[in-house]
């Protein structure tokens, strides 16, 4: 993946939607991610690039070995020839999910066309790549590690005038989040703001109290789904948009990471088969 690759689409990330499109969330039906084979290079193009082929073989082994719930499988890409990485990037293509991780050492992450195979880049300055790797996982370990690395528990304080439901919603979320912090909840606790009377003041109040986290994820698997961590431990904002970018479902979810962000075991198994087909086509 070269340094100039525009992984994340315009308008992606915290603050990219208006105030009227702030927090909400319930679960959507789970389906396998779609596979669209990228435009593959001609077999002759790979003849002088054995490293690219070797990396594909290692990726095949990682997909065959990985099981959901286990430690992710990582294939380092640092110090590999740029030409081989460019070919690898062409072969793996871009999948449905893009992730942006903020903080002192930001990262950009793109799922490949193989669900559960992620291209991770660490950056400094104006996007200079200082480390990168392929990772086979339901979601990259960096996302879990950094989502709530810098958080705080908000104080309720005195409620401002003009609120309809934000006060009770915040109390409910904080109660669930504290239980989750003590012992991970067996099932996510979700609050669907789309079903509640909510004023602009409600939305501003929740946004200010919960704060803005360091992880933002965009999935094109079900139209557009935008997932963002808040600055409050365990609380995620999950929003669904239609093809016109209109907010159609707005939720807040207490969980380790929303399930819609994660590849399933069937996705991993399917990706192993797809990669096998790709490698055969390149022979």
UniProtKB/Swiss-Prot annotation:
InterPro entries: HupH_C_sf, HupH_Hydgase_express_prot_C. It comes from the Bacteria. Residues 1-29 are annotated as: Disordered. Belongs to the HupH/HyaF family. This is Hydrogenase expression/formation protein HoxQ. The lineage of its organism: Bacteria, Pseudomonadati, Pseudomonadota, Gammaproteobacteria, Pseudomonadales. The gene is hoxQ.
